[in-house]
Amino acid sequence: MSDKRPVVIYGANGFSGRLIAEFLREYNLPFIAAGRNRARLEDVMKHVPGIESANYEVVETKGSVEELTQVFAGAKVICNTAGPFIYNGPGVIEAALNAGCHYLDIGGEQAWLREVAGKWGCKFAQRGLLAAPATAFMSAVSDAAIRMCLEGHRGIDTLEVLTMFKGNPTFGSTQTIFAVIQTDAYYLEQNT
């Protein structure tokens, strides 16, 4: 859509999308706030502190791969916050690849992570692009803690991680919970 706005936040009308918009505004990074409902997008953006100084554009899209590809054209990075990712992610990641953009999301859904690794990772790498799911604090912090625990400790054969939260889940998070319980769960045993 615009080479002047290198970041597209897809799902910017949600809680995480607003936080990302706030971060981008703070660092003077131009962005497109995209989603399925212009009125909700505009309302959420009004609540971003200092938004009046941001270089951003609100774009409504119905979410088809073709339409998303047009919205993403000219951007460098697509930040997908529209879960459940197992349902909403495939079209967004395909459009990001079509538009030649790096892709990241805030998901933590195991089925979606497996799909990105199995279907999309190599396609992005072949084009010199990055597909990075699960970049939000829930997944990223746990991953960093696990790596720190295992550094230099080859004898550990089991590590269980529990992430606990305070507060109430958002509507989007609730939808993700119900999506996840309908998918198969996997675990590594002896790293296989």
Describe the predicted segments one by one:
Residues R5-Y27:
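N-terminal Rossmann NAD(P)H-binding glycine-rich loop of SDR-like oxidoreductase domains
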Residues Y10, F15, E151-T192:
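Active-site-lining helix/loop region of Rossmann-like oxidoreductase modules
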Residues N13, R36-R38:
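Residues in the short beta-alpha loop(s) of Rossmann-like NAD(P)-binding domains
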Residues P30, R40-E115:
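NAD(P)H-binding glycine-rich loop region in Rossmannoid oxidoreductase-like domains
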Residues A33:
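Short beta-strand "acidic-cap" motif of Rossmann-like dinucleotide-binding folds
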Residues V48-A54, F124-R127, R154:
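Short helix-capping segments at alpha-helix termini
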Residues G107-L130:
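Rossmann-fold NAD(P)-binding glycine/threonine-rich loop
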Residues R127-K166:
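Adenosine-phosphate binding glycine-rich loop
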